[in-house]
């Protein structure tokens, strides 16, 4: 109690002095040395009394806004982390699929290379056979033509020799003999 009465006594003293001079109980003095401390004390008291609620409300509201912003940021972070994990999984699957497609393409290329090589060998063998057959048929044609020419030349030569060696009488005897052999 002594501390309260100790604070009230100077206040009462100032109030009685100001009342004695004809001023109000609490007044504002514009004399710097006399009234500045009292005015500041009153201003601080009013600010503390009324400002506590206002500042408390502002701080509470700000605290709630910050907490809500933190919760929203954490939720966004969780959502982003989930999306990132899903996209990483999709990327891994896509990379596996790309590797599988690449391996399949390599295998297909090897298979096609082998098929093309085999087909080329078959084509070469067929061309060789065709060329050999063409060569063989050409040889046969040339041989047949040569035989025909030789036979024609032999007949021409034989006829010329027969004409030179055989007279009409000998020709008639050969004809008769040939007819007799044939059954006539």
UniProtKB/Swiss-Prot annotation:
Domain of life: Bacteria
One protein family per Pfam: ATP-synt_B
Entry's localization field: Cellular thylakoid membrane
Gene Ontology MF: a single term: proton-transporting ATP synthase activity, rotational mechanism
Residues of the signal peptide: none
Gene Ontology cellular-component annotations: plasma membrane-derived thylakoid membrane; proton-transporting ATP synthase complex
Transmembrane segment boundaries: 36-55
Membrane-topology descriptor: Single-pass membrane protein
Alphabetically ordered keywords of this record: ATP synthesis, CF(0), Hydrogen ion transport, Ion transport, Membrane, Thylakoid, Transmembrane, Transmembrane helix, Transport
Subunit structure of this chain's protein: F-type ATPases have 2 components, F(1) - the catalytic core - and F(0) - the membrane proton channel. F(1) has five subunits: alpha(3), beta(3), gamma(1), delta(1), epsilon(1). F(0) has four main subunits: a(1), b(1), b'(1) and c(10-14). The alpha and beta chains form an alternating ring which encloses part of the gamma chain. F(1) is attached to F(0) by a central stalk formed by the gamma and epsilon chains, while a peripheral stalk is formed by the delta, b and b' chains.
Family: Belongs to the ATPase B chain family.
Function of the molecule: F(1)F(0) ATP synthase produces ATP from ADP in the presence of a proton or sodium gradient. F-type ATPases consist of two structural domains, F(1) containing the extramembraneous catalytic core and F(0) containing the membrane proton channel, linked together by a central stalk and a peripheral stalk. During catalysis, ATP synthesis in the catalytic domain of F(1) is coupled via a rotary mechanism of the central stalk subunits to proton translocation.
Entry-linked PANTHER family: ATP SYNTHASE SUBUNIT B, CHLOROPLASTIC
Protein name: ATP synthase subunit b 1
């Amino acid at each position: 109690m002594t501390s309260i009465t100790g604070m009230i006594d100077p206040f009462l003293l100032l109030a009685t002095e100001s009342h004695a001079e004809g001023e109000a109980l609490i007044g504002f003095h514009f004399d710097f040395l006399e009234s500045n401390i009292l005015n500041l004390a009153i201003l601080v008291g009013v600010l503390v009394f009324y400002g506590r609620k206002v500042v408390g409300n502002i701080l509470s509201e700000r605290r709630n806004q910050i907490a809500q912003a933190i919760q929203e940021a954490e939720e966004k972070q969780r959502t982003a982390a989930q999306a990132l994990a899903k996209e990483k999984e999709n990327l891994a699957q896509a990379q596996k699929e790309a590797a599988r497609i690449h391996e399949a393409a390599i295998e297909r290329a090897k298979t096609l290379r082998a098929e093309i090589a085999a087909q080329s060998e078959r084509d070469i063998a067929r061309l060789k056979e065709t060329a050999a057959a063409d060569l063989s048929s050409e040889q046969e044609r040339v041989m047949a033509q040569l035989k025909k020419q030789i036979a024609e030349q032999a007949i021409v030569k034989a006829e010329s020799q027969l004409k030179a060696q055989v007279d009409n009488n000998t020709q008639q005897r050969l004809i008769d003999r040939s007819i007799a052999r044939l059954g006539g």
